[in-house]
């Protein structure tokens, strides 16, 4: 694979790049890999994975589940461990070490705290 920057720099890698990132948000760069919700945000499964491109995950403030918005500064970061566990499990790798994130309040897999009275 060859990745070319907007400045013409070229980087070669033997593995498919995992992250498409930019200041506008990565969801715009990979929008063709996601079904869209009626509100224009990507449709995700419970593990923040695309419903049409298995193995493609979305992290960041564009993540939405039902009417829950994962705030830009803090809450969306709590979903990183959820994605990491899903990837590790799919590869047959141990994921128990990710539980340490839960003890620090950085493992958000229970969305019941995301309602009207957001705890963050």
Model-based region annotation:
Residues 33-37, 42, 48-49, 75-78, ...:
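A sequence-level detector of short, solvent-exposed, charge-rich linear segments
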Residues 12-13, 20-70:
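FAD-site-proximal beta/loop scaffold in flavoenzymes
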Residues 54, 58-101, 106:
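A conserved FAD-binding loop/helix module that cradles the flavin
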Residues 107-120:
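Acidic, Ser/Thr-rich low-complexity intrinsically disordered segments
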Residues 1-33, 91-106:
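A Rossmann-like FAD-binding core segment of flavoenzymes
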């Amino acid at each position: 694979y060859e990745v070319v920057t907007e400045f013409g720099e070229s980087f070669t890698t033997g593995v498919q790049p995992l992250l498409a990132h930019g200041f506008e948000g990565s969801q715009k760069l990979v929008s063709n890999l996601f079904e869209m919700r009626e509100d224009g945000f990507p449709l995700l499964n419970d593990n923040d994975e695309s419903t049409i491109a298995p193995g493609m995950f979305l992290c960041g403030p564009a993540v939405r589940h039902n009417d829950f918005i994962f705030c830009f500064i803090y809450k969306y970061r709590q979903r990183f461990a959820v994605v990491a566990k899903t990837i590790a499990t799919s590869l047959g790798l141990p994921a128990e070490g990710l539980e340490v994130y839960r003890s620090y309040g950085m493992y958000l897999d229970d969305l019941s705290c995301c309602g009207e009275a957001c705890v963050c």
